[in-house]
């Protein structure tokens, strides 16, 4: 990828790792993922990005991520939640692609950013109507 951040543990890279972990976790929690699944995804992304000693604490309303190897710690408030298992599935798919080195860390972050803004959410009335037609 043009302009990719080098694989050295630079300050910018550490910040990108933590931003990517937080974004993935935020999308998952806001979309109805279980806390343990969110934490697992965050720690896997960090480990695959070169931070095997990450620390993650997640509740239904917040995410805390840090690295034991440095003073990097970040938190994110999760003020709202809904059910959008498509987003949860897509975050997991992107995480697997990153683990298999099919995409780079900057690509993962970019795709998560697009996923956060471009994946449609549906109103409750529309979801109920679709359930009526599938039942």
Residue spans of the language-model regions?
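Short, amphipathic, aromatic/basic-enriched membrane-interface segments that mark the entry/exit
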Residues: 114-126
